[in-house]
């Protein structure tokens, strides 16, 4: 691909999940399971995040997630609740649909720094005590969807600085 250093690993090489915003979680799960996608289970608690850069903490902590595994890809359903959130904004402006694509990375801080060097801005981010977490990148205008990088808990541990 022209203009790209092939020796550098893309931050978007390991697709982890698709996140879909829904109005009604129960109805969405009923539909997806009726066509063979599921079962859905609870997403780990959002209260695990100790450092947050989000639009509104009330909106963040009232997001309701359910997840199902489809092959190697996770399907996340998200129903916004009380407070403000990008998910709620998306639902109000565009209706239900794919809000973001999530990519797993070895080190979320390093990935975020690399993406900033490419001119991408961070919409929101969160980190757990072990340094794992997420960064939503502001790509919707150019890519048609928000792109997210995430480091799973228990993944590569932070190097002492």
Say what each PLM segment does:
Residues 5-10, 88-94:
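Short, flexible, solvent-exposed loop/turn segments with mixed acidic/basic and small polar residues
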Residues 28-32, 115:
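Conserved active-site tyrosine of GNAT-family acetyltransferases
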Residues 34-40, 118-121:
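Conserved acetyl-CoA-binding loop of GNAT-fold acetyltransferases
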């Amino acid at each position: 691909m022209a203009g790209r250093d092939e020796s550098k690993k893309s931050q978007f090489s390991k697709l982890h999940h698709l996140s879909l915003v829904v109005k009604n979680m129960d109805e969405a799960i009923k539909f997806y399971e009726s066509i063979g996608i599921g079962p859905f289970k609870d997403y780990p608690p959002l209260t695990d995040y100790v450092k947050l850069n989000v639009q509104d903490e009330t909106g963040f902590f009232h997001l309701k997630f359910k997840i199902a595994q489809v092959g190697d890809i996770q399907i996340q359903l998200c129903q916004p609740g009380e407070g403000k959130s990008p998910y709620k904004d998306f639902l109000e402006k565009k209706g239900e649909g794919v809000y973001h694509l999530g990519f797993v990375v070895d080190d979320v801080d390093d990935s975020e720094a690399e993406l900033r060097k490419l001119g991408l801005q961070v919409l929101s981010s969160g980190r757990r005590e072990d340094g794992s977490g997420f960064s939503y990148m502001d790509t919707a205008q150019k890519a048609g969807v928000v792109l997210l990088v995430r480091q799973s808990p228990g993944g590569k541990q932070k190097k002492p600085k």
